[in-house]
């Protein structure tokens, strides 16, 4: 009789730095009940990948889960699939680090009784040159999306078999994940899943359908806990799929013992289809969505979808300069600390992918995820001898200046306003400058008219189908920055400028200093100077920065050739997250802040009274449950009138 082989897999992962209560909820609502129900169905088999971050948490907090997993491995119900231990995008890290990351998770798999030969490719980000690394790491097969194969020119009906792919003479097996199954499981009634699998049944004994997707879909995604567990979807699914004569449940390793891959293919750089939208710059992503919708209106999308391609994952380093800087700092430390065992774990942890990008989850917009990356980068950097240096760390063709002592790392971009873009405390392992800019995202417009695409369907919505509308109170506060956020950004305002216009990015910048190129000289500290124009009057700005044991000091001199009716503002964007601030205008010589659950306590001290504008820097980003309106940090702008010459001293001090 016609049959279909069916491989069912899940991928369990929590980002580095995620809140303990989130881990606990994911465990109680998804990871634990899934495994306990699997134990009830001895004929059901599952390929499971668990990221090393989650493994460490489970071993420390839920050892019973690990014991149950071992038991299921012994019984042959579970096959362990590995990846990089700390869930890096393998294509974005050096080969030496890829190998180390994979070996770490393979070693853990051996500890629980499984010699893993298969790899879950994080975010399914494929590059052909990965083949050599994977084979060197002892990997025999890798799991990617069917979209990768379609991008290589294969038709949908050719995607129910694994294939070989080759690079540099090394060969590996690649399994395609069926996208339709990703959207059916577990969101549609079991009947629909079974019907689809039956439709694939064939006399060809080697034909196989693969589902491998997030384990969080089974209980954590919105509305899924009730659907999957309380209403019995998972039990019904396991029962029916494991007892259906037309469906042959098997593991990847079992398939490869029985059948050979179909042939040889060459896959292009790719990820799953949604990633090609998310990774595009916002304006292009908007056009991409419009194009896809137009094809759907014309009933042409399914036919021509294979030729619809957007961006690649590494585009996020172009889209978000903050992600690029963080990533290039990681590459710098990976290179410098390759032979330092005590620093290596910090580097590997800092390669966790989640904080470097943004799609339907918060990603880079979640401060606690970035904070975890920075914490590990700073701990790794602390193993280097502190010294001042000049290098192009972020590969933009322009040099940055590093000022460093035993307690602080300061990185200045002379070519971008002579501003500080990293102010890292080694004692606290925090980067005070970790404030992401407010950017327009392409879905900010889409949200006005979208509704739940699944409202007339049986089952529950996937997070890709949940409609979102921006609340009006948030919409009226939305603002988009004209420049990256840093520390010591030099503004010139009209004398009658207001805080409200400033914070909503409606003000007029009179100078050309924010993104201007500063000359510089490095000695014990850093001296920067620039001559520019303010209201057609020549103005010179000079600032001398010194790193101190408890922070940094800066001396400003501002000289104008003529008297001008304008204000000079020094903006400091500080990564204050746990104190929910409101816009406020102050007068004084000192700002003292205690961000107890964030960067800690610090103060900004001035040599003379100033007007101070303070406001929270908030971004709007989509998430699995709707909208996140998040305080990324606080902008403190020190303002003085310009009267021919200004001499200002400012001290940032960690308390």
UniProtKB/Swiss-Prot annotation:
It comes from Pyrococcus abyssi (strain GE5 / Orsay). It is an enzyme of class 3 (hydrolase). It comes from the Archaea. Keywords: Carbohydrate metabolism, Glycosidase, Hydrolase. This is Alpha-amylase. GO terms for molecular function: alpha-amylase activity; carbohydrate binding. InterPro entries: A-amylase/a-glucTrfase_C, A-amylase/a-glucTrfase_central, Gal_mutarotase_sf_dom, GH-type_carb-bd, GH57_Enzymes, Glyco_hydro/deAcase_b/a-brl, Glyco_hydro_57/38_cen_sf, Glyco_hydro_57_N. GO terms for biological process: carbohydrate metabolic process. It catalyses: Endohydrolysis of (1->4)-alpha-D-glucosidic linkages in polysaccharides containing three or more (1->4)-alpha-linked D-glucose units. SUPFAM superfamilies: Families 57/38 glycoside transferase middle domain, Galactose mutarotase-like, Glycoside hydrolase/deacetylase. The gene is amyA. The keyword Transmembrane does not apply. The active site is at residues 123, 214. Belongs to the glycosyl hydrolase 57 family. The keyword DNA-binding does not apply.
């Amino acid at each position: 009789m016609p049959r279909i082989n069916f491989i069912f897999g899940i991928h369990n992962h929590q980002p580095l730095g995620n809140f303990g209560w989130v881990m606990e909820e994911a465990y109680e609502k998804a990871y634990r009940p899934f495994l306990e129900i699997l134990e009830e169905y001895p004929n059901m088999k599952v390929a499971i990948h668990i990221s090393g971050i989650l493994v460490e948490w489970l071993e420390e907090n839920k050892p019973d889960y690990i014991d149950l997993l071992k038991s299921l491995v012994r019984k042959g119900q579970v096959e362990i699939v590995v990846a990089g231990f700390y869930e890096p995008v393998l294509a974005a890290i050096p080969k030496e680090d890829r190998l180390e990351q994979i070996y770490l998770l393979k070693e853990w798999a051996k500890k629980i009784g499984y010699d893993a030969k298969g790899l879950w490719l994080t975010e399914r980000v494929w590059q052909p040159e990965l083949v050599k690394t994977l084979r060197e790491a002892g990997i025999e097969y890798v799991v990617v999306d069917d979209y990768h194969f379609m991008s290589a020119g294969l038709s949908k009906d050719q995607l129910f078999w694994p294939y070989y792919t080759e690079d540099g003479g090394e060969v590996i097996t690649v399994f395609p994940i069926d996208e339709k199954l990703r959207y059916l499981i577990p969101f549609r009634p079991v009947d629909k899943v079974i019907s689809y699998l039956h439709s694939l049944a064939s006399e060809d004994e080697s034909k196989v359908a693969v589902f491998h997707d997030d384990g969080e879909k089974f209980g954590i995604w919105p509305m899924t806990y009730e659907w999957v567990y309380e209403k019995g979807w998972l039990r019904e699914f396991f029962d029916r799929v494991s007892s259906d004569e037309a469906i042959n449940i098997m593991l990847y390793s079992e398939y490869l013992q029985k059948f050979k891959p179909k042939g040889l293919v060459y896959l292009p750089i790719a990820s799953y289809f949604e990633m090609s939208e998310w990774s595009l710059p916002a304006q292009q992503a908007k056009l991409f969505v419009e194009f896809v919708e137009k094809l759907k209106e014309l009933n042409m999308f399914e036919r021509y979808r294979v030729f619809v391609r957007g961006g690649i994952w590494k585009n996020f380093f172009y889209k978000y300069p903050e992600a690029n800087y963080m990533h290039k700092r990681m590459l710098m430390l990976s290179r410098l600390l390759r032979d330092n065992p005590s620093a290596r774990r910090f580097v590997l942890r800092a390669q966790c992918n989640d904080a470097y990008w943004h799609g339907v989850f918060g990603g880079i917009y979640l401060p606690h995820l970035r904070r975890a990356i920075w914490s590990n980068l700073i701990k790794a950097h602390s193993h280097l001898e502190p010294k001042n240096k000049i290098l192009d760390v972020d590969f933009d063709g322009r040099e940055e200046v590093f000022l460093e002592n035993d307690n602080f790392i300061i990185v200045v971009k002379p070519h971008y306003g002579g501003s500080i873009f990293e102010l890292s405390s080694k004692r606290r392992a925090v980067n005070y400058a970790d404030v992401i800019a407010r950017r327009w995202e392409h879905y900010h417009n889409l949200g006005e008219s979208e509704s739940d695409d699944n409202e007339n369907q049986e089952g529950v919505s996937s997070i890709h189908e949940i409609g979102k509308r921006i609340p009006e109170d948030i919409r009226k506060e939305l603002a988009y920055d004209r420049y990256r956020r840093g520390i010591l950004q030099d503004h010139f305002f009209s004398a009658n400028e207001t805080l409200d216009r400033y914070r909503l990015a409606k003000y007029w910048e009179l100078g050309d200093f924010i993104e201007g190129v500063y000359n510089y000289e490095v000695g014990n500290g850093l001296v920067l100077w620039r001559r520019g124009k303010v209201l057609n009057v020549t103005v010179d700005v000079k600032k001398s920065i010194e790193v101190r044991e408890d922070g940094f000091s800066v001396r400003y001199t501002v000289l104008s050739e003529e008297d001008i009716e304008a204000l000079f503002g020094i903006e400091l964007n500080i990564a204050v997250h746990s104190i929910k601030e409101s816009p406020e205008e102050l007068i004084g010589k000192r700002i003292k802040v205690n961000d107890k659950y964030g960067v800690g306590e610090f103060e900004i001290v001035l040599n003379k009274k100033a007007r101070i504008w303070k406001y929270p820097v908030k971004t709007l980003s989509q998430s699995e449950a709707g909208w996140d309106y998040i305080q990324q940090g606080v902008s403190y702008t020190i303002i003085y009138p310009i009267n021919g010459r200004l001499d200002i001293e400012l001290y940032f001090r960690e308390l």
